[in-house]
Design a protein with these regions (language model features):
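Basic, alpha-helical terminal appendages of large translation-related enzymes
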Residues: 210-283
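Amphipathic alpha-helical interaction elements
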Residues: 123, 197, 253-254
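Residue-level recognition of alpha-helical structural elements
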Residues: 2-3, 153, 160, 201-204, ...
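Short, mixed-charge aromatic SLiMs
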Residues: 102-109, 158-160, 185-191, 269-276
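Active-site lining segments that contact anionic ligands and/or coordinate catalytic metals
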Residues: 93, 202, 247-248
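Structured secondary-structure scaffolds
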Residues: 1-177, 181, 208-209
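Amphipathic alpha-helical segments within well-ordered protein domains
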Residues: 120, 193, 250-251
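Active-site-proximal binding-pocket segments
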Residues: 74, 138, 142, 148-151, ...
């Protein structure tokens, strides 16, 4: 991976770099030589420390818990920036994480190609949590991830509208008037914590859907509580299991889909009422 790539380069000859450029009109001039301008990467990297220090009064703002960067600027951040910090006697970031690219139909996003997707455009189409799901679910943590509006639309309808949204609506409608007590509050699954800590957001979401949402859907379809009388204890038992699973799903979704998590927990607390509208309407 990226770690091996950098370690391999460091084992070969690493040459000194010049921290200034000659006859560059824009940039910070070297104080003792006006013909020289500070190399843009040198002054830009300092901002991680200096700019953050300017806007916070917290003493523990440094070192960074995690330094997130794109793969094309790996060398500058994992070698040059680290060397600068060591030279200044400052702590290194606790972790550096390098991600790959979001691609549009196999091509890099480019203003000249006009294939850029803006977060605002996504939020208008899919809502804020819908967009968070689509972006996190396609997160290019190891390899480039191919995305596009139509791909996102299909994923949104399949995973959120038809699956999660439909499941929450069905259970809420079937459970009308029911009140389910919770003996202990659900906690975030250790596997989800582990994956989020590794920034494997797509895998974290996959685990949540597999473990809680898909299994609850399958359980509900298998047990068919709608075929049973409303006062049948078996029906109440099936719906109680489904509600508890959805509460667990909501707690696990909170770091990535906070609004959705809140709505699910609100829906299944107290005396349950049917939803007025789906969490994720089809698009």
């Amino acid at each position: 991976g990226k770690r091996s790539e950098i370690l391999s380069k460091l084992k070969s000859e690493v040459k000194d770099i010049s921290l200034s450029r000659e006859k560059v009109d824009w940039g910070i001039k070297v104080p003792w030589d006006e013909t020289q301008t500070v190399y843009v990467w040198f002054d830009a990297l300092i901002n991680y420390y200096s700019a953050t220090r300017m806007v916070t009064n917290k003493k523990d703002f440094w070192p960074a818990e995690i330094h997130l960067l794109g793969k094309e600027i790996l060398w500058f951040h994992t070698v040059i920036w680290q060397a600068m910090l060591l030279a200044a006697g400052l702590d290194l970031p606790k972790r550096t994480y390098t991600h790959s690219f979001y691609m549009i139909d196999g091509q890099k996003m480019s203003k000249s190609l006009g294939n850029v997707i803006s977060p605002g455009q996504l939020a208008e189409l899919f809502g804020v949590d819908g967009s968070r799901y689509l972006i996190a679910g396609s997160f290019p943590n190891k390899n480039d991830s191919d995305i596009g509006i139509e791909r996102f639309r299909e994923k949104y309808n399949a995973d959120l509208a038809n699956n999660l949204g439909n499941l929450v609506s069905r259970v809420a409608k079937l459970s009308e008037g029911l009140e389910v007590e919770q003996n202990e509050s659900p906690v975030i699954d250790n596997q989800v914590i582990e994956k989020i800590n590794k920034l494997e957001l797509d895998e974290a979401l996959g685990h949540i859907f597999d473990t809680y949402i898909d299994k609850t859907n399958n359980y509900l379809n298998q047990e068919s509580p709608w075929k049973l009388d409303k006062n049948d204890n078996k029906r109440k038992e099936i719906l109680t299991v489904s509600i508890l699973n959805l509460r667990k799903a909501a707690v696990n979704l909170a770091p990535i889909l906070p609004q959705t998590s809140e709505k699910i927990l609100e829906t299944f607390s107290g005396i349950i009422k049917p939803l007025e509208k789906s969490l994720f309407p089809r698009i």
